[in-house]
Amino acid sequence: RQKLATPYWVTYQYSKELQSQPIHTTTHAGQEFDLVVKGTLRVRVGEHEEVLHEGDSIFYKSSTPHGMIAVGGEECTLYAVVMRPQKEKKPEKDTFEALIKAKQDRADHETVASPFVHTELDENGILKSIDFMNEEKFNFAFDIVDKMAEKEPDKLAMLWVSKHHEEKRFTFNDMKRMSNKTANYFKSLGIKRGDRVMLILKRHYQFWFAILALHKLGAVVIPATNLLMEHDLDYRFKAAGVRALVCTPDGQVADEALRAAKNCGTVEFLMMANGAREGWLDFDAEVEKQSDVFERTEDTACGSDPMLMFFTSGTTGYPKIAEHNYKYALGHYITAKYWHNVNPEGLHFTISDTGWGKALWGKLYGQWMCEAPIFTYDFDKFDAHDILPMFKQYNITTFCAPPTMYRFFIKEDLSKYDLSSIEYSTTAGEALNPEVYEQWKRATGLSIYEGFGQTETTLSIYNPVGSVPKSGSMGIPSPLYDVDLILPDGTPAPVGETGEIVIRTDKHTPCGLFMGYYRDEEKTREAWSGGVYHTGDTAWRDEDGYFFYVGRTDDVIKSSGYRIGPFEIESVIMELPYVLECAVTSAPDPIRGQVVKASIVLTKGTQGTEALKKEIQTYVKTNTAPYKYPRIVEFRDELPKTISGKIRRVELKG
């Protein structure tokens, strides 16, 4: 891994169709030297294009967008040498001293969360312990949002930007007033404590009005994505007993929901925000008519009462329903303060859509408990060119996105964008490839602080503020959870050995851990029994206690007595400049039991040849233990995925 350069033989097939199209470009770390051995090549580097013939060569910085196609009516073969960047010392924004000072400056600040949360830091400024008080009386909407409206009514709660770049600024007083009006509207319909209400609102600002209103009413919130189709919604309506739906008019989801609701006997109220349509109640118009006073009562839902349901995005079978109580919000205090490192005077941007649990990690609970405003961009489709200028435009200070988004960012020429406002960057949702971490750090001076959690939990493993993250590691256990690694026989996994990540609950059930799977005692017992919650994810830990992700328990490959995790192999393959996406699974083998199989999506214009397969296999052999190399390599146009974007490995096995 210390070698300075990697050589490749690359063949571009001639395509008549590509001759009239703009050359597709990509980026990667380091520098590149290309020598044409046979044929003719048109090369684009940045805004510059030229044609190379046999014997011609070109040398360029490969972080500049570049691409090439064969011209002249025949295939072109070239010898490419990719030179890895040297580890250069440069000023870093997230120096240990700076992070500790920032944390200490905020440590003694009395917040609206103080009556409920007590924390202790160690001598290095890293979170040592967290305890909760009065949690059985806790209701986030009343105890945090309404208290902030009393304390600082004009403080910014959310800066919202529409897909047309129209801006709206909402203060905490706005959030209190509009959530009260919305609660009164729901109440007028007869929606009450315990009723299940689904929200399909993308990143519309009405989502925040609705979820806070439902928390005040005691109704159970079910966030859902606008990507659902009729059969998805039909299952969800029936499985959860959904009584009401607030929906976006965007796309086709409203039509899908209307058809599904007609087949389901439980859905009584269909409300549409941001528009009016036949068959739907006009959410915006009706809310505006209501009183902005809604008082807390002695029997207001709180503590252990059900508050929230998420449909898990499992890769096999129908999704389960993870149910959370009102203490779930408290579990996200660590998420915001000790992982996102939010600044009450800054602006936090978590990119997730409200249909996913990750949105509540970064767009609501923890951030507002820390009195930090959030930034929301209500876009339709992710576009790095669209989002990157916003960091400077809106002075965004902390940022969280899944690794996929960072991968899109680093393929751009980041030198064109002013990212200097960003003080801290984090990621979760999938394992972070080391190559992405290194390229982002070189471009911005910022480490990416990885974290791990599930729909059933809050942040359970993380790289905390004040620590020095290890590239490729998802971090250390959060003090909120008693996290362990166990072998199949239930004994603790030794250092360096793969085990399943579990959370021990024999001493106490932490705020943030789910109540169980709704209406499914069997699945709940399978995952959580004997004082142990099984995550189904595997990892290994080093001598410093840092965890390194391996894969799902059913994704581990058992070949010739070896246990092989897919993520390490995927990370190596992702280092190759022509690989856009990959997934590693198992395939049956009569001699070895299983062998490693790599399913790969190539960058546009790259041909999946037998020679390229051998090159990939050789690269993996060279850069990791040889027994891990993929004996089967297949090229695909795309990888099968769940609605939430997780790769369906079960479809790739075999």
List each language-model region with its residue ranges.
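AMP-binding/adenylate-forming catalytic core of the ANL superfamily
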Residues: 228-238, 245-250, 399, 505-510, ...
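Structural core segment of the AMP-binding/adenylate-forming
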Residues: 104-105, 188, 212, 216-285, ...
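Conserved pre-ATP/AMP-binding loop-to-beta segment of ANL
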Residues: 153-156, 271-272, 278, 288-311, ...
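ATP-dependent adenylate-forming carboxylate-activation enzymes
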Residues: 201-202, 219-237, 249-256, 352-354, ...
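Conserved AMP-binding A3 loop
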Residues: 168-173, 299, 307-331
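Conserved AMP-binding/adenylate-forming core of the ANL superfamily
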Residues: 154, 158-212, 229-234, 284-288, ...
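Conserved AMP-binding/adenylation subdomain of ANL enzymes
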Residues: 330-350, 354-397, 412
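Gly/Ser/Thr-rich phosphate-binding loop
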Residues: 285, 369, 396-401, 410-470, ...
